[in-house]
Amino acid sequence: MSKRPVIDRNLVLDAAISVVMDQGISALSIGEVAKAAGISKGGVQSCFGTKDGLVEAMVNRWKADYEASVMARLAPDAGVLELLTAQIHIIAIPDEELSKRAAAILMAMFSQDSLRAQANDWYRSLLLGGAFESERGKRVRLAFLAATGAFFLRSFGIMEISEAEWKTFSEDIARLLPADASAP
């Protein structure tokens, strides 16, 4: 009896992201992902079950990668303001391909109520609270909101932003940060 081939979930997730990047969120289906990954529909279903399971896996992988990037920039005792500052510096990295991938994943995330609710809860926990009562906290939060807004404008193609313009925007946003919020 032959051994069943093992499907690389990460390659299937990459194929799903490519489908969304190339064709839009409405094209995301088990069939399209299977075609892009070069496997059967059953292969995709055996990895993720349903389209919702596929989307959830896309978002979870992206979140884990993003959180690892942020945590790598932080000291073990970092607080919420340092966490936001690290995210601002990650957002400032001019990487058009990464922006497109993030936009694809965000579009997938926005297609599911449960994932949108998780994002809402995450942002609320990140941006509200006692740390933002001080002037320093307010400046860090404002810089984070500006960086996130610029990132969304660029990633979703709402505004074409050249590398030089992105650098200028990032420098402007960095000036919003308090002097003690150095680049991690």
Which residues does each PLM region occupy?
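Pocket-edge positions in alpha/beta enzyme catalytic cores
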Residues: 4, 75, 158-161
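Helix-turn-helix
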Residues: 11, 15, 19-53, 57
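Hydrophobic alpha-helical connector segments
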Residues: 57, 64-103
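Solvent-exposed, amphipathic alpha-helical segments
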Residues: 15-23, 69, 146-153
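Hydrophobic/aromatic-rich alpha-helical bundle segments in the mid-to-C-terminal region
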Residues: 114-120, 124-184
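N-terminal intrinsically disordered/low-complexity leader segments
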Residues: 1-7, 181-184
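Short secondary-structure transition hinges
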Residues: 85-132
